[in-house]
Structure formats: C-alpha cells, structure tokens
Design a protein with these regions (language model features):
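PRPP-associated nucleotide enzymes
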Residues: 1-143
C-alpha cells in the first residue's frame, strides 16, 4: 500500500507541475479522507512540504439523498483554506459508478471555483454509470 501511495504522489507532483504548497487534497468522507492524508504525507516526503488537506461529506449532495438520508450519518465538510483558482485533487478510496465523485464535485464547487479539479483514487473498480475518469489511480480492480 505504501508503495502505491508513493507512486501516486510522484505522479501527482509530476503531472500537476505544482509545488506541494499549491495543491489542495480533498478527501471524500469516509474512506477518502485517510487516503488524502496519506497521499499528503507521501507528497511531503518528495517535496519537503505538504499540501493542504480537507474533507467533504457528500450526504446531502447524493442523487439518492431522499431515500438514503433517514439512515445517513451526516458529518462536517472541512475545507479551511481558499480553493478559488487553486489545483484541487479530489481523493477517494474506491471509484466505481462515479456517483460519489459527482456529488463530491458539487460539494467542492460550493466552496469556490478551483482552477482545476483532479481525481485520485486508490482503487478503480470500473462499472461507471457516469462519465467520470480518474487522473491518478493506485490499482485497477476488475469487477
């Protein structure tokens, strides 16, 4: 797992062309937050500075919110830095249908207008229902 995160961190640094201090990693609650923190640490090991890290809770942004909300545990979104004009890397642990990422993008846009939103996922399982494609993938798992 550590090797995969290091490889993803190197790819993020190379492809974005930005210093770590210019990047914002935003993890999707729940699984994406830990991945975002670990990616930030791996980037800091490469760049000697860490990117900012935040988190979004997408419970209210889901397209099935009306049916899912009675059982949903809504947590806080924590983006405590400006994202206007910044490079934001949305981070999740697993990408499959794309619906979670669509909701996460909507949530991020409520905080401002980033220059660009990248997508990093630890596992890409395929099975898309929406046109979502990750920029950085740890491992691809066929379902």
């Amino acid at each position: 797992m550590q090797r995969t995160l290091r490889r993803m961190a190197l790819s993020i640094v190379e492809r974005t062309g930005k210093r770590a201090s210019e990047l914002c990693l935003v993890g999707v609650r729940r699984g994406g937050v830990d991945v975002a923190k670990r990616l930030a640490e791996a980037i800091a090991d490469l760049e000697e500075e860490a990117p900012k890290v935040g988190a979004v809770d997408i419970s209210l942004y889901r397209d099935d919110a009306a049916t899912a909300l009675p059982d949903a545990k809504i947590g806080p979104s924590e983006i405590r830095f400006p994202i206007d004009g910044r490079e934001v890397i949305l981070v999740d642990d697993v990408l499959q249908t794309g619906r979670t990422i669509r909701a996460a993008i909507d949530c991020v846009l409520d905080y401002g207008r980033p220059r660009r939103i990248w997508l990093a996922v630890l596992f890409d399982r395929g099975g898309r229902e929406l046109p979502v494609h990750p920029d950085f993938v740890g491992k691809t798992v066929d379902v």
